Amino acid sequence: MSIALVTGADGFIGSRLVELLVKKGYKIKALSQYNSFNNWGWIEDIECKDKVEVLTGDIRDPHYCKFITKNVDIIFHLAALIAIPYSYVAPDSYVDTNIKGTLNICQAAKEQGNIRVIHTSTSEVYGTAQYTPIDEEHPMQPQSPYSATKIAADA
């Protein structure tokens, strides 16, 4: 059985991905950002949570990233700070999580033996559409600190 690590599993899309991967037969390590309430976000509501190993931690910690990537076959990296308005108030937090956190996951995957990483992005990297439908050739136009950090993480 393949083991998948899902970062950002506590978010809406991450929790839906966890459910899908469980149905497809994956053993899941689901990363939820640590909080003092021990709340797992959207993972709390999934029907298959008893089949999921929930880990609480922070992708900003490179040592923790090395720890959670041990014995993993694939990583689905969805973890990110996403609140656009707050990115103007605390842009360094977005740099630390969205850029450095992504780098930590990628470096840990490489050090563990080149684990495949599937990284998610956002339509925010394209800014205001110059044409529709937007495709991957559309120019990137960051319009917030959030979208700028997602563009950097995509690179």
Give the role of each language-model region:
Residues M1-A155:
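N-terminal Rossmann-like NAD(P)+-binding domain of SDR-like oxidoreductases, especially those catalyzing
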